[in-house]
C-alpha cells in the first residue's frame, strides 16, 4: 500500500491532555482542565432538555440539510438560509474549504502561529503554504499577508480573534485589508470566539459579506455555547459560494442531537451574556496576576489567555500537571516561553493563579 507522501509529514491533531490520563499518570483525584478553551459553565439548560428529547430518535438519520437549525440560525443572524453551511465543528469547514479550493498548483496564505488546521489541511491538498509571522504583540501582519498573495493564491486565512494569542483585528483594519485582496482569493474569517469579544471596534463581519463576495465567516457552537462534545459549526457567505462548496460536505455531517441542541442554544442568549460577563471577570484575574509578576499577557478577546513567563513553557506545564492543572504549553503553539490557559470559573482561576504564584516565587527564591 502507498500512502500519500504529504501525510507522512503530518501528525494527528493533539488536543490538551485528557483528564483521565492525567489522573492515572500523577495519581490525582481532582483535575482542572484549562487547556481546550471549553466553556467552564457548560451549556444552556434548554440545550440539555433538547438533547434529552432527541434520545427517542437515535435510530433515525439526521436531516442532512439541517433545515430546522438553518431556519433558526438564519433568523438569528439576519441572513438568507442559503448563505449557511454546517459542519461537524468548524474544523470540518476548514477541511471543506481546503478540499474545495486547494491543490498542488495553488498556494494559501496563513498567519503564524495560528490555528494549526489551516496548515494541516493545506498540506493534505498539496498546496504551497505561505506563512506570515505575527507582529510583536501577537497581531496579524496584514501587510505581510497581502505581499504573499499572487495569481496562484486561492485562500487567505484570518483568525479573528486569533488562536493562540487572543488578539483581534478592528473593522477598519479588516476593511482596509479586504479592499486590497484580489477578487479571485477567498478570505476565511475564523470567528470561533466571537461571542466572547468585548472590543467595540470588532468587525461586523456579516455586514461585510454584502460588499465582499470572496469572504466566508466561520463560527462554532463549541466555545461560548458549550456544545464542544456535539461538534457543530457553521459558515456564512454568499449564496453562490455556499452552493459551490456544498458538494465537498459529507452527508449527515451534523447529528440529530447536535442540531437540536444548537437550535435550543441559539434561543438562550441570556446564557451567552452571562458567560461573557463571567469570562470578562476571569480575564481581569489573569491581568492582575500578570501585572503583579511583571509578565506580558497578550490582549485577549477570547476565553483564554496567553502569558509569557520568560522561561521554558514545558517546565511550567509539567509542574502544573503535577498539581492537577491541564493547560497548553506554548512550545507546541509557537510560543516556547508561554502558557495558554483557558479562563475557568472564578474559583478555578484563583486556584491555578495561586499555584502559579507559588511556582514563580519558588523559582525566584
Curated annotation (Swiss-Prot):
E.C. code: 2.6.1.9
Cofactor names: pyridoxal 5'-phosphate
Top-rank taxon, per record: Bacteria
Molecular function terms from GO: histidinol-phosphate transaminase activity; pyridoxal phosphate binding
PROSITE patterns: AA_TRANSFER_CLASS_2
Keywords: Amino-acid biosynthesis, Aminotransferase, Histidine biosynthesis, Pyridoxal phosphate, Transferase
GO biological process, one term: L-histidine biosynthetic process
Pathway info: Amino-acid biosynthesis; L-histidine biosynthesis; L-histidine from 5-phospho-alpha-D-ribose 1-diphosphate: step 7/9
PANTHER family noted in UniProt: HISTIDINOL-PHOSPHATE AMINOTRANSFERASE, HISTIDINOL-PHOSPHATE AMINOTRANSFERASE 2
Protein name: Histidinol-phosphate aminotransferase
